[in-house]
Amino acid sequence: MKNFKDPTDAEVRRYFPDGWAGDVEDKLTAVGRSARENEAFDFVRKLATYSRDHPALHSGKLMQYLPQDDLYMYFRYDAIGTVMVASNTTDKAAALPTASFSERMAGFTKARNVLTSESLDSLATLQLPAKTAVVLELGK
């Protein structure tokens, strides 16, 4: 959960103990996980469930933009919905003006943060904390 290729990415790809014979731990149950592991597990579950239930994410079109100042933005969309993903890979919070993404954002005036359920009533500028990504379901 915290290894960033230091010195390799082997820790990121390590075996997941899920209760099979010989596993000392069972990370598929909340009892077998730490509070931080439960937080990560719930995060992945929420994203996986959202992806499963929204066709734009698995069968929609992709529109992405070149990263600017280590901020990356892309959209997955279909006739039913549009999902925006914005990522800040820097060590500092950043404000991301969205005017340059008008080709994909035209007509949308609000959004819902998929991870927090927070509503955004303005899409003019996105506030992105350091080292985070947001997943926004756009609305009119």
Task: Please name every model-derived segment.
Residues 77-79, 116, 139-140:
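Short, flexible beta-strand-to-coil junctions
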Residues 83, 113, 133-135:
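Generic alpha-helical hydrophobic packing signal
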Residues 100-116:
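Solvent-exposed beta-hairpin/edge-strand motifs
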Residues 60-62, 108-111, 136:
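Short glycine-aromatic motifs
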Residues 1-105, 128:
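Loop/helix patches that line or flank the sugar-binding groove of alpha-linked glycan CAZymes
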Residues 18, 113, 138:
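Active-site donor-binding loop signature of nucleotide-sugar glycosyltransferases
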Residues 121-140:
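C-terminal beta-strand-rich structural cap/linker in extracellular carbohydrate-active enzymes
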Residues 47, 111, 131:
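A residue-level signal for conserved active-site and pocket-lining positions in enzyme catalytic cores
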